[in-house]
Amino acid sequence: MTKAKIVECVPNFSEGKDKAVIDNICSEIKTVDTVEILDVDMGADTNRTVVTFIVESKHAANAAFKGIRKAAELIDMSQHTGAHPRMGSTDVCPFIPVSNTTMEECVNISKELGELVGNKLNIPVYLLSLIHI
């Protein structure tokens, strides 16, 4: 029997006041097979929410993409205010190896997600440091 390859994903969404928006984003993420949302931390002062979920690595990019797409639909950045600096409706979306997976696999998931977001949503994507391994 093969053990599941599990990664954690921690997208930060630029909405921390409207629970309905965050509930919609989380509902969209949960439509992907094997997703388990572990935590949703809304911050009104920063107007930012950190969602933490785990998922099998083969579904990770799709789950994150669905959340990012829903955030882009629902969050109006032209009206956004908050104490935390932000660049878009989704600021960061790191992947962390949890079990039977590696950082290199997480880097590859990040690259896959970046391509999806750039190509399907026409949203600029910036990839951070470990992306170069």
What do the PLM-derived regions correspond to, one by one?
Residues 131-133:
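Conserved small/polar residues in nucleotide/adenosyl-binding loops
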Residues 2, 25-50:
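N-terminal glycine-rich anion-binding loops that anchor highly charged ligand groups
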Residues 25, 64-70, 108-113:
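Short amphipathic alpha-helices in soluble, non-transmembrane regions
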Residues 17-21, 58-63, 101-106:
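Short, conserved charged micro-motifs
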Residues 81-90, 120:
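Active-site histidine-anchored catalytic micro-motif
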Residues 4-16:
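Short glycine-/aliphatic-rich beta-strand segments at the starts of folded cytosolic domains
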Residues 56-84:
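Active-site cofactor/substrate anionic-group-binding motifs, chiefly glycine-
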